[in-house]
Amino acid sequence: MSQMRVTDFFSQSKRGTAAQNSKGRKVEAVLETRRAVTRSRAASVKAEEFLKAPCTPERASPTVSQCIGPSSKKRTRQDSDSEPLRTQQRQGKSARKKLKLPEGEHGGSVQQQLFSPCNKVALEHVTPSSLGKKIKDMVNVSLSPKFNELARNPTTPETKSPAKENLLELKSRLQRIQELAQKVNLPAASSEGKVTITDLKARLKRAQELDTKIRAKAEKTETQAIDLTEQPAQESEKAPAYQRFHNLAQDAAPGLTLPYKYKVLAEMFRSMDTIVGMLFNRSETITFSKVKQGVQDMMRKQFEQRNVGQIKTVYPNAYKYRQEKNIPTFKDGVKKTDYQLTIEPLVAEGDMLSGRPHLSASRLLERKQLFHRSLTSIVKQHHRVFLTSLNPPMLVPDDKLTRWHPRFNVDEVLDVTPAELPLPPQVERLTTAQEVLSKARGLITPKMEKALANLALKTAENAGETKNVSTEETKSTATTSTSTALKGVSQSLLERIRAKEAQKLQAIMTRRPQQEERLLMMSRLPELARILRNVFVAEKKPALTLEVTCSRVIASCRSSMSPGEMEKHLALLSEILPDWLSIHPVRKDTYYKLNQSMDLNLILERLAKKTKEEESL
């Protein structure tokens, strides 16, 4: 026997022998449908539209497909209808997923309803055209959204007399709205019907109160706007930071330092005195224009008559100022007949050279020192006013004052007010509009002058009253703020604290520079004592040389110090605590001996106590 091939099984269907028996009949049906396709195209289109449903129907039995009627016409139609069914069934065997139709009203799906046995029997006795029409209607009804909603929720309001319930709800809502409207309208009508004079008065009073509140609010906004506009102007008038905080940036030791503007004024006086001395020794007429050009070349700063007035305020006996004319200037802008400010230095009778006054270099140095002392005395006056304004007030003699109060801001001291310089004599010439107006002022009648004077007095009084009110308000706010901050604290305790603080500040202000340096060294001693003990413990020796001790302590100390400074600190430590650290000079070397049996905490307490005693002196 020959071996069977795989292709021999292609003609067999999955249904087994039933499909093999009907093989001949299938071939005949296919041939007949090919002949009838052209004649029954309309019927096949309708069947294809139905067969395009999501689910492929079950395969019909050979009896249904071969149901031949009495006439050949009906048979050809049935064959043409059944052929697309078979082709679609063959296509249904592919790997494409089936789309399940929604379930019907009685729980079964539309597919089951369409192809149930009872429907199959009914379809056998119907013509193809009516069959397609009925199946289409059935599918459309089953696939419509309304049908699905009814299938899912059979107890919707549409099934249970929805019209009655909706009418009842609407009626109840209308009734509630009418009741609420009556409740709202009743009080308004009653109040409108019973309007009395008291009600009108109350309303009028309320309107007046609202009017006053609105006006007060408008005034408040205006004042705030004015303050906001004035604040930038004040900030722009402030000096730059390098001038306001010049005192804090100085490298020198703290003392009676001058503000930045006072230092600039002192430098201006030195430059001016130098130029005046040169011109005076050459017997030249000293004018302000010559001095101005020379000072500006030396300082690279603007020099005006205002600065000359400040110099006159600080040192009034330095120069003699006059207005003179007929001085040759050799300038196009200044005429010989114009008045000019002349400056002449006041020299003592003993300063003579070759029979005439002479301004020597030593005299210039003395004048410079005298000007500096005058500036310092002006700052001391401001400092004295500041001390009296403290609570409690302090009084420190000027000769014992070595530094300013810590809260006294030196760079915010008021500038020196310029003194009046001699002005050129006025000649009766009406050359400007201002002169014409001043001349026409004499034409005003006495009544008009009196009225203008009264108006000026009234405006001045109003301005004074507003200033007094503002000062009183600021004082009251300051007292209330301090009282609220110190609420619950006894007055005697506050006075004692303030007195102690004032005493401490007074001691700081009158302290000598040597004492200040000693206190600074004593503040570093606790840290040095700790490091020194660790060094001796690590070395495991009772005594160490000076060089070794200083090098070890400098290496461990936070602040960098030279060996000479470290030697001074150790000498001070041995002076304060001789029983703990002792110095022993042996031949050419110096040894430090430390008593390691003493407690370090006791040593630190003794150092702190000694520091407090030194500060209180």
UniProtKB/Swiss-Prot annotation:
Entry's Gene Ontology BP terms: DNA replication checkpoint signaling; DNA replication preinitiation complex assembly; mitotic cell cycle; regulation of DNA-templated DNA replication initiation
Entry-linked Gene3D superfamilies: DNA replication factor Cdt1, C-terminal WH domain
DNA repair in keyword set: no
Record note on modification: Ubiquitinated by the DCX(DTL) complex, also named CRL4(CDT2) complex, in response to DNA damage, leading to its degradation. Ubiquitination by the DCX(DTL) complex is necessary to ensure proper cell cycle regulation and is pcna-dependent: interacts with pcna via its PIP-box, while the presence of the containing the 'K+4' motif in the PIP box, recruit the DCX(DTL) complex, leading to its degradation. The interaction with GMNN protects it against ubiquitination.
Major place of residence: nucleus
Domain of life of the organism encoding this protein: Eukaryota
Location of region: Disordered: 1-27, 51-111, 462-483
Subcellular location: Nucleus
A single cellular component GO annotation: nucleus
Biased composition (Polar residues): 1-22
Keywords: Cell cycle, DNA replication, Nucleus, Proto-oncogene, Ubl conjugation
Residues spanned by motif PIP-box K+4 motif: 1-25
Pfam family of the protein (one): CDT1
GO MF, one example: DNA polymerase binding
Alphabetized InterPro entries for the sequence: Cdt1, Cdt1_C, Cdt1_C_WH_dom_sf, CDT1_Gemini-bd-like, WH_DNA-bd_sf
Family: Belongs to the Cdt1 family.
Function recorded in the entry: DNA replication licensing factor, required for pre-replication complex assembly. Cooperates with cdc6 to promote the loading of the mini-chromosome maintenance complex onto chromatin to form the pre-replication complex necessary to initiate DNA replication.
Entry text on domains: The PIP-box K+4 motif mediates both the interaction with pcna and the recruitment of the DCX(DTL) complex: while the PIP-box interacts with pcna, the presence of the K+4 submotif, recruits the DCX(DTL) complex, leading to its ubiquitination.
Subunit structure: Interacts with pcna.
Name of the protein: DNA replication factor Cdt1
Organism annotation: Xenopus laevis (African clawed frog)
